[in-house]
Amino acid sequence: MLRQLKSLFEAPAPRPLPGFERRHLQVAVAALLHEARRADYHEGNDEYALARAALADLFGLEGDDGVAVLEEGRARAEQLTSFYAPVTIIKRDFSLGERVRLIEHLWRVAYANGELDPYEDHYVRKIAHLLYVPNTQSMLARNRARA
């Protein structure tokens, strides 16, 4: 009886994501990275390399796996009419720390060509807001990305 009562107040153990859910999360992140790449209407090789690095950092995706997820994310981003679907998946499956890391990667993509376009700035701030990343955390991530 005491054990059951105690279990009510303990945090549940994090459950590993099944393969298909993990893939949806990866594609959602890739779609947001693709949108960051094209926010200034110029998609460069540096931005692509940073998007691949983001997937490697966040999910351990390298090589052909990373390219496939980025391509699937690009296709998904082309069909998006709002950011609701990818943002909902990311909010559900990423902790705050992981969402801050994602925002830092989005800032890196935005700064890939050495300058920040106003459209890129607006995009990353908007996504940070939708992901419930506090503004202070987003700005600290921005400073780390710029350094």
Task: Please describe what each predicted stretch is.
Residues 1-147:
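Small-residue-enriched hydrophobic alpha-helices in membranes
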